[in-house]
Amino acid sequence: MWHWHRFQEHEARRSDAIVLLRKIMSNESKSNSLYAFESLESNVRFYSRSFPVVFEKAAGAILHDESGREFIDFLSGSGVLNYGHNDPYFLDEATQYLRSNGIIHGLDMATPAKREFMECFDAIILRPRGLTYKFQFCGPTGANAVEAALKLARKATGRHSIVSFTNGFHGMSLGALAVTGNRYYRDAAGFPPAGVAFMPYDGYWGADNDTSEYLDKVLADASSGVDVPAAIILETVQGEGGINAARKEWLQSIQRICRSHGILLIVDDIQAGCGRAGNFFSFEFAGLSPDVVVLSKSISGCGLPLSLLLLKPELDVWRPGEHNGTFRGNNLAFVTGAAALRKYWTNDALSARVMETGRIIAERLRQVAQTNRARSLSVRGRGMMLGLNCGTGKLAERIVRKAFEEGLVVERCGAEDQVIKLLPPLTTDEQTLRRGLDILHKSVAASI
């Protein structure tokens, strides 16, 4: 009898599951229902809380939810979609590759797709800039590439400590988290990350204080308590840290300090690179020559996972397989990444467009700040990586929520989430850009 009841319970559950599956397959569960996400997905989910609709389609700078409502995207996958959603050329290249039975997963084996990506990158990006780097393909996330960069720096120099900066953000895995400044993320590690000394970023002590002088002094002083590190890691524009843009002179000073102390310079260009700050590399305007460059996010062109290191040849001290990962050979991402290089980077047109569009956005943000002088709003950033500092996280949250209600997707950043971060696709047309800025302007006015 007991077994019969168990059988009946099993059959009842099976019947319920079949009914639910049929409902899912018949689309009855759709129309922007978030029930599945709220009931099945972990509490760690984030963006679906900020933007509580089900996004279904996208093209360029426009998103559509399941009900067909349109949203202007000034988030771009947090910097992944510099060229917008679903570029037709990228999709065509990817589709042709898939139909040809091209290798999709290949570990780090030699494939035509990887060869073409490296050759395109070398010919289009590196050689015209007088740069010589070797490629290291890491796991699919930027954090994994940061891990590889830190490991390589320690292996190449024989030193162990790393210098990072206040408000820096480099990823969520333990090594990357150790060089990340934000306490909210660091606390989630469960133990205090070690081996990192944090120094004040440019402007941290105000515009009149050159924090690089402090760094130079403590490194030169054997009694400062700060060891000469294996590497200094930095973002030239801090994204998650609040759109803090370092001055050219400060960056050049950091590079001089690295050279004088035999320290490797790692530039994390995961978010600021691939044209977001103007040039392909965000450090070009300062004339830097980093020892290691970390790239991810927009490097694949259309949102496919890909990350890599660019390292100077003399630093290639790895033994075979010493840093590996199952998904370090995303060949479809190589295909779309090469397509992006061919389409956008064989001349300076996109860089010029980014700088001009950035000026338009910055001027509009200054108008917003001027209109609301009582709240001491301010504008920050470079290129099309810009932010509106609202002073408090609560005000920024109200503005972002109102903007979403009006059809604009934009997020917050900074230590207190007090900065509204604008990352529209670099290819956004003027009409869409102005519509988005109009919504933001109205949302600020309605929230103050």
Curated annotation (Swiss-Prot):
Keywords: Aminotransferase, Plasmid, Pyridoxal phosphate, Transferase. Its cofactor is pyridoxal 5'-phosphate. The keyword tRNA processing does not apply. The keyword Transferase applies. The modification N6-(pyridoxal phosphate)lysine is found at residue 297. CDD domains: OAT_like (cd00610). Pfam families: Aminotran_3. Its EC number is 2.6.1.-. One of its GO terms (biological process) is ectoine biosynthetic process. One of its GO terms (molecular function) is diaminobutyrate-pyruvate transaminase activity. It comes from the Bacteria. InterPro entries: Aminotrans_3 (IPR005814), Aminotrans_3_PPA_site (IPR049704), Dat (IPR004637), Ectoine_EctB (IPR012773), PyrdxlP-dep_Trfase (IPR015424), PyrdxlP-dep_Trfase_major (IPR015421), PyrdxlP-dep_Trfase_small (IPR015422). Belongs to the class-III pyridoxal-phosphate-dependent aminotransferase family. NCBIfam families: dat (TIGR00709), ectoine_ectB (TIGR02407), PRK09264.1 (NF006733). This is Uncharacterized aminotransferase y4qG. It comes from Sinorhizobium fredii (strain NBRC 101917 / NGR234).
